[in-house]
């Protein structure tokens, strides 16, 4: 049972099914899902971790200004090889490009998170965090790349892949938060909510 010290609703500023599933793991079912629909383009010379946090902040701010009461959770995930930011894929060509960039290399996954507490149409508190995980992918064969592209699992994903599917069998090692790689670091998210007055673990019983 979710325990909130002020019983305000949770609003997820994302239509990501992965983030919704992750929140359910910590007993949170958002009252509303409101995608922010912002321009997610990077700025010139912007670092990957800065992009992830900037976009999360913009998403949270856009939704929070239209909320009467609640906690707005916004996140953005960026995949980078060195300082090269990989795209959020739209086409099979995008996925193939990302896989070739990731093949045989380490890459970093950054998720920026902002949680904003709104009461009586006023922002009364917020918390931000950026979490980094490191992943090493095996050297992929042309057949492995073609097979993964054909699954369509990499479409509409940061870096052209989803760790929840076939991609996991290509990973040699990971360091850091697994849920961060999926799109929402649960340890940090729970602590951020708690600092704002919401405990998703404590039971009323």
Swiss-Prot record:
Q: Catalyses which reaction?
A: a ribonucleoside 5'-triphosphate + H2O = a ribonucleoside 5'-phosphate + diphosphate + H(+); a 2'-deoxyribonucleoside 5'-triphosphate + H2O = a 2'-deoxyribonucleoside 5'-phosphate + diphosphate + H(+)
Asked whether the UniProt record includes Cytoplasm among its keywords, one would answer: yes
Give the enzyme's EC designation: 3.6.1.9
List, from the UniProt record, the residues annotated as the active site of this protein.
76
Keyword set includes Hydrolase: yes
Report which residue ranges the record marks as coiled coil: none
GO terms under biological process: nucleotide metabolic process
Source species, domain of life: Bacteria
Its job: Nucleoside triphosphate pyrophosphatase. May have a dual role in cell division arrest and in preventing the incorporation of modified nucleotides into cellular nucleic acids.
Family named by the database record: Belongs to the Maf family.
What is the name listed in the Swiss-Prot or TrEMBL entry for this protein?
A: Nucleoside triphosphate pyrophosphatase
């Amino acid at each position: 049972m979710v325990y909130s010290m002020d019983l305000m609703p949770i609003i997820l500023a994302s239509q990501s099914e992965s983030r919704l599933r992750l929140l359910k793991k910590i007993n949170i079912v958002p009252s509303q899902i409101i995608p922010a629909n912002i321009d997610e383009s990077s700025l010139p010379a912007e670092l990957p971790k800065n992009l992830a946090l900037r976009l999360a902040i913009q998403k949270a701010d856009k939704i929070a200004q239209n909320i009467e009461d609640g906690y707005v959770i916004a996140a953005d995930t960026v995949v980078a090889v060195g300082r090269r930011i990989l795209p959020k894929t739209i086409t099979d060509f995008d996925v193939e490009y990302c896989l070739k960039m990731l093949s045989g290399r380490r890459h970093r996954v950054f998720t920026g998170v902002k949680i904003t507490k709104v009461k009586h149409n006023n922002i009364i508190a917020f918390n931000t965090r950026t979490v980094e995980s490191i992943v090493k992918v095996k050297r992929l064969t042309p057949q492995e790349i073609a097979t993964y592209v054909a699954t369509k699992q990499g479409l509409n994903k940061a870096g052209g892949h989803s760790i929840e599917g076939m991609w996991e069998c290509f990973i040699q090692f990971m360091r850091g938060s697994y849920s961060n790689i999926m799109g929402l670091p649960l340890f940090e998210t729970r602590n951020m909510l708690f600092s704002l007055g919401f405990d998703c673990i404590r039971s009323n019983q």
